[in-house]
């Protein structure tokens, strides 16, 4: 499978992507990680309005292969939860970097994405040469 690595995305070591939009940060899981999980059967996400610290889990993705937690790559408040992914987990599988986003966060600080990988750095980590 060939994966997309949009230039405007940043990535955490734990395969979450971050997309900055109007001062808010949209978070999801990379196509690579979703492909490794196989068929997604259940998604659970933290509630809107919840404030979390960097490294805390904000959700769980259950597939036929495994149950994986998703981690917050920075501290902040959840301002929106993608209810569509909870109702239709296949959205996450079919379009993880589009309609399959998980939450939108208001970051605690401007430097939130400074520690994350660029698309090129992430691609070199997950795609064999």
Predicted regions and their residues:
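Acidic, low-complexity mobile loops and tails
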Residues: 1-54, 90, 94-129
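Short, well-structured beta-strand-loop connectors
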Residues: 47-61, 72, 77-79
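Short, glycine/small-residue-enriched coil/turn segments at secondary-structure junctions
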Residues: 3-6, 70, 74
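Residue-level recognition of beta-strand microenvironments
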Residues: 18-20, 64, 81-84
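Domain-scale activation on soluble regions of proteins
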Residues: 58, 85, 126-128
């Amino acid at each position: 499978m060939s994966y997309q690595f949009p230039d405007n995305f940043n990535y955490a070591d734990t395969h979450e992507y971050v997309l900055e939009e109007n001062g808010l940060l949209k978070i999801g899981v990379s196509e690579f990680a979703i492909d490794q999980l196989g068929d997604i059967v259940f998604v659970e996400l933290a509630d809107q309005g919840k404030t979390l610290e960097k490294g805390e889990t904000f959700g769980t993705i259950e597939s036929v292969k495994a149950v994986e937690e998703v981690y917050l790559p920075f501290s902040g408040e959840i301002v929106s939860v993608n209810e569509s992914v909870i109702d239709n987990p296949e959205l996450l599988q079919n379009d993880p970097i589009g309609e399959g986003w998980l939450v939108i966060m208001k970051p605690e600080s401007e430097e939130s994405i400074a520690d994350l990988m660029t698309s090129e750095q992430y691609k070199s980590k997950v795609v064999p040469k």
